[in-house]
């Protein structure tokens, strides 16, 4: 008996067992079975190089193992990879104990907010505690069981620490239920004490069997369908909001059929954008604070809002003024029950694609009363054309962001940066020049607002926006994740100078592994979007421009930085040089960077429904701030309260 039992086990270290288990995880989406864990990003230190590092070096299986260059950066690459593939595949990431693993926290927050599966494998202190305190250990007075990795608990959907080799089994089974469940997907942390990583155990062979995690499309109940049909049939001007959940559901075709059949306009959240083509006639574009005039116009007319996989963030709802249950009824389709309950909506806890398809079958001959959708969209396209040709050299030029910088300040920026290029002109020039199958990513600063309004993604799933956590520094590592996910398509990071400075280390990873990415740095020498907010709320410009202690505008040569890494770099300060740089970059096989100097205050501004509740000071000596505070109070009075 004992001998037979022995044959049914295999003696492995904890790290070896982990690697073997990862190799056996598969996912079934609509009958298509693929491996779930593509690989692992690693920055090795003393806490993981001898345990997990040795296991990967000895036998990684099919896992692709990449060396990262910043923990937050490589985790962002993993997040973008999974997001681009609708969460059907993941990367794991590992770092050493202490500061290396602490660098995961921001990325974990990003994954949590956006419901993106990623497996964090931070090294930890010794489970035995014999050598305590070890290098990079935090000694906590109230608990010897607390380490740096505990900081990952609030930003993990599941968190565990493996203090004995056999604990790995139950921990991983729970972890992969979370990682493969569309309703609960998000970051998982499995902390690995460095002594336990190398400890051996007789693991049951059954633990390493091929495991296929079936992604079930949750169907709406008959009561949910009947209730939604009744609400839609009673409405005259319904609007469909397409959120990130609709994209993850691969609901594009169902959305178009539903919209076309019933003449229902579509508006998009930042995450939902490109679920369908921008050319689709009823697609009015981005909605909310960063929305188009077309999208916000139809939202204003809506008597029913159908939310398809949206979380209703403040940027979508204009801090609950554009969407108000006291004025508009709502239907929420979401796999997450809590999300479906928002705004006192009629909840449908189900898959977006299948719910819309079944509603299409049930609504029969219904048609909305919208008669002017084409006119509304055409008017917005005319405005987009104007923004494509804004000209600083025109007589009496007025920037899009008005009444903040005077003509003298604008001239100083033009002289220092040696540019007359406006940001809207540059963004649309890029949109019109890159191949339509190319994928762009943006995340922070003023660029998310510009691309939400004026970027037209003709090809679905070519627009990758991280505006849930709006993590500065996401863009460059995300471009690499996108390239790994879609190697046959060009990947472009649209990034401001402030965000690029915060994090761009995975450009080195892209160069190291010959994965071409393209970085477009829009440099206006400052944290310009926050400067806009600061001045719009009455404050003076303060620590949001990049100026020396002598108050001189700073100019950074980002092209030279990229060249130092080994990338092909370009400089652009007008439309002609920008287009020429893009065209030449297309021909390159190495990663590229275009240093685009743009003028501040030349990004897009609000179009209707753009009130945003921010924390203006109640007491200030500045009369402009006093007025801004009163304006905020007026907005609060109009907003929905919960």
Curated annotation (Swiss-Prot):
What's in the keyword line of the UniProt record?
A: Hydrolase, Magnesium, Metal-binding, NAD, Thiamine pyrophosphate
Which terms in the Gene Ontology molecular function aspect does this entry carry? Answer: 3D-(3,5/4)-trihydroxycyclohexane-1,2-dione hydrolase activity; acetolactate synthase activity; flavin adenine dinucleotide binding; magnesium ion binding; thiamine pyrophosphate binding
Q: Coiled coil where?
A: none
The cofactor(s) it depends on are: Mg(2+); thiamine diphosphate
SUPFAM superfamilies linked to this entry: DHS-like NAD/FAD-binding domain, Thiamin diphosphate-binding fold (THDP-binding)
| EC identifiers of the protein | 3.7.1.22
Which pathway, metabolic or otherwise, does it act in?
A: Polyol metabolism; myo-inositol degradation into acetyl-CoA; acetyl-CoA from myo-inositol: step 3/7
For the keyword Lyase, the answer is: no
Q: Which residues bind thiamine diphosphate?
A: 71
Q: Can you tell which superkingdom this protein's organism belongs to?
A: Bacteria
The protein's annotated catalytic reaction(s) are: 3D-3,5/4-trihydroxycyclohexane-1,2-dione + H2O = 5-deoxy-D-glucuronate + H(+)
Q: Does the keyword Ribonucleoprotein apply?
A: no
The record's remark on the cofactor is: Binds 1 Mg(2+) ion per subunit. Binds 1 thiamine pyrophosphate per subunit.
Q: Where does Mg(2+) bind?
A: 497, 524
GO (cellular component) term, any one: acetolactate synthase complex
Chain positions covered by the region annotation Thiamine pyrophosphate binding: 446-526
Q: Which GO terms describe its biological process?
A: inositol catabolic process; isoleucine biosynthetic process; L-valine biosynthetic process
What the record says about family reads: Belongs to the TPP enzyme family.
Q: What does this protein do?
A: Involved in the cleavage of the C1-C2 bond of 3D-(3,5/4)-trihydroxycyclohexane-1,2-dione (THcHDO) to yield 5-deoxy-glucuronate (5DG).
Q: What is this protein called?
A: 3D-(3,5/4)-trihydroxycyclohexane-1,2-dione hydrolase
Q: Name the source organism.
A: Lacticaseibacillus casei (Lactobacillus casei)
Protein's gene: iolD
């Amino acid at each position: 008996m004992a001998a037979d039992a022995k044959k049914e086990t295999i003696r492995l270290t904890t790290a070896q067992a982990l690697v073997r288990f990862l190799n056996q995880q598969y996912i079934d989406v609509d009958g298509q079975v693929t491996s779930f864990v593509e690989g692992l990003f690693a920055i090795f230190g003393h806490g993981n190089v001898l345990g997990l590092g040795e296991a990967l070096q000895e036998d990684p299986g099919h896992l692709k193992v990449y060396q990262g260059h910043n923990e937050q950066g490589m985790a962002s690459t993993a997040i973008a990879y999974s997001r681009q593939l609708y969460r059907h595949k993941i990367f794991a990431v590992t770092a050493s104990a202490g500061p290396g693993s602490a660098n995961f926290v921001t990325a974990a927050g990003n994954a949590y907010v956006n419901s993106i599966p990623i497996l964090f494998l931070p090294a930890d202190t010794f489970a035995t505690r014999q050598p305590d305190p070890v290098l990079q250990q935090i000694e906590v007075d109230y608990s010897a069981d607390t380490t740096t990795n505990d900081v990952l608990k609030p930003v993990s959907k599941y968190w565990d620490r493996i203090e004995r080799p056999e604990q790995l089994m139950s921990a991983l089974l729970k972890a992969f239920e979370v990682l493969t469940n569309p309703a609960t997907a998000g970051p998982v942390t499995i902390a690995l004490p460095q002594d336990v990583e190398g400890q051996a155990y007789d693991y049951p062979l059954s633990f390493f069997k091929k495991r296929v995690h079936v992604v079930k499309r949750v169907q709406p109940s008959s009561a949910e369908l009947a209730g939604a049909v009744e609400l839609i049939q009673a409405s005259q001007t319904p609007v469909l909001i397409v959120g990130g959940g609709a994209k993850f559901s691969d609901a594009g075709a169902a959305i178009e059929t539903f919209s076309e059949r019933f003449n229902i306009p579509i508006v998009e959240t930042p995450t939902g954008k490109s679920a369908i083509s921008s050319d689709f006639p009823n697609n009015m574009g981005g909605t909310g604070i960063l929305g188009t005039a077309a999208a916000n116009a139809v939202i204003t007319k809506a008597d029913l809002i159908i939310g398809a996989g949206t979380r209703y963030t403040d940027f979508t709802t204009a801090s609950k003024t554009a969407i108000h249950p006291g004025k508009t009824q709502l239907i929420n389709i979401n796999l997450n029950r809590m999300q479906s309950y928002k705004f006192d909506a009629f909840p449908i806890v189900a898959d977006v694609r299948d719910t819309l398809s079944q509603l299409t079958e049930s609504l029969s001959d219904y048609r909305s009363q919208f008669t002017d959708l084409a006119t509304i969209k055409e008017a917005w396209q005319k405005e987009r054309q104007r923004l494509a040709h804004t000209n600083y050299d025109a007589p009496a030029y007025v920037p899009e962001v008005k009444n903040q910088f005077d003509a003298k300040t604008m001239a100083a920026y033009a002289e220092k940066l040696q540019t007359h290029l406006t940001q809207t002109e540059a963004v649309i020039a890029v949109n019109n020049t890159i191949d339509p199958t190319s994928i762009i990513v943006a995340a922070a600063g003023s660029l998310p607002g510009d691309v939400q309004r004026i970027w037209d993604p003709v090809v679905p799933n070519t627009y990758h926006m991280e505006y849930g956590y709006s993590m500065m520094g996401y863009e460059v590592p995300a471009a690499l994740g996108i390239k790994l996910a879609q190697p046959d398509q060009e990947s472009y990071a649209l990034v401001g100078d402030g965000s690029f400075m915060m994090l761009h280390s995975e450009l080195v990873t892209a160069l190291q592994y010959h994965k071409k990415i393209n970085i477009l740095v829009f440099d206006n020498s400052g944290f310009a979007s926050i400067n806009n907010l600061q001045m719009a709320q009455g404050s003076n410009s303060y620590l949001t421009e990049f100026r020396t202690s002598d108050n001189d505008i700073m100019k950074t040569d980002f092209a030279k930085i990229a060249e130092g890494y080994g990338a092909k770099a370009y400089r652009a300060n007008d439309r002609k040089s920008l287009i020429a740089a893009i065209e030449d970059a297309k021909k390159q096989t190495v990663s590229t960077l275009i240093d685009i100097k743009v003028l501040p205050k030349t990004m897009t501004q609000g179009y209707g429904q753009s009130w945003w509740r921010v924390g203006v000071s109640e007491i200030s000596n500045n009369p402009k701030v006093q007025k801004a505070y009163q304006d905020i109070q007026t907005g609060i009075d109009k907003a929905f309260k919960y």
